Amino acid sequence: MNAPKPATSHTQRANAPRDLGMDDQDFDRARRGRIAQHSTGVIEGPLGVAWDSSRHQYVLDSEQPDTVHPSLWRQAQLNAEHGLFSVADRVWQVRGYDISNITFIEGETGWIVIHPLTVEPAARAALDLANEHLGERPVVAVIYT
């Protein structure tokens, strides 16, 4: 794999850290309601690793490089927050184990699932996480968005 090229002076100036008028409330919101996380963050499928949350950890552990705009780096940090989250009464989301979020609504007879993710291993891991921490329920409806 080729090493990334350094930022040009123009890019460095454009991406220089600065006050963008954003506070840390978004980080508090992104973490609010987290109940649990996948034990390893690595979701295995029949063809190998389907998702690996640790591959996104670098955005939380390192400084913004001069090749990335500060607002994009911040968005990547917010997106790196993962796990099972309480959203509202009888509504939970699993975030950060696919390119989208999966929502679980506690129905009278089981889970109503909204947006079942893009691959089965991630959806299975999300369902397992919900069942483990919220109680085992069957899936009774799936809504694709």
Predicted regions and their residues:
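Residue-identity detector for threonine
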Residues: T8-T11, T40, T67, T103, ...
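N-terminal pre-domain segments of enzymes
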Residues: M1-E81
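Conserved beta-strand hairpin/beta-sheet module of binuclear metal-dependent hydrolase folds
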Residues: Q77-R137
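Metallo-beta-lactamase
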Residues: V139-T145
